[in-house]
Amino acid sequence: MNLPRRAIAPLAERGRFFAAVIETGSHAESLARVAAGTADCAAIDCVTHALLVRHRPATVARTRILEHTGLAPSLPFVTARGTDQATAALMRAAIIEAAADPALAESREALFLAGAIAAEPDDYAVVIDNERQARELGYGELR
């Protein structure tokens, strides 16, 4: 939520922008609430939005995109903190291999995955920087 929060920060008044913030538990539910008129807006990542266009077109048709945030790395693949380095390296290699395997092209297309690269924590610095900027602008918490 750091990129949307940073985009909203200049518009917030005394640290507030929304009358209420609702946590729905999923992007699909957030979009459904916007479509139903029980929420004014929601932040939906572009991959999830594309999947919802494909699988819930009637819901998406009752919404429209207001704005896009700045660019940031896509959502990461994650594993448990306790996963040892050797296993994590094997998992990373398998993901990158699957992302390039021609036999899996149809599956990747179904998930809107163009590929995968090994990311480092520094690759996500833009997300942390957006959080810092939002805090500096007085919008430290989404509200």
Locations of the language-model features?
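Short beta-strand->loop
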Residues: 19-20, 53-71
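Bilobed "Venus flytrap"/periplasmic-binding protein-like clamshell domains
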Residues: 1-31, 110
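Short, conserved beta-strand edge motifs with alternating hydrophobic and charged residues
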Residues: 23, 42-45, 66
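An extracytoplasmic/periplasmic, membrane-proximal ligand-sensing/linker region
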Residues: 72, 79, 85-143
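A ligand-binding cleft/hinge motif common to bilobed small-molecule-binding domains
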Residues: 10, 35-36, 40-60
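Hydrophobic residues within well-ordered alpha-helices
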Residues: 34-35, 77
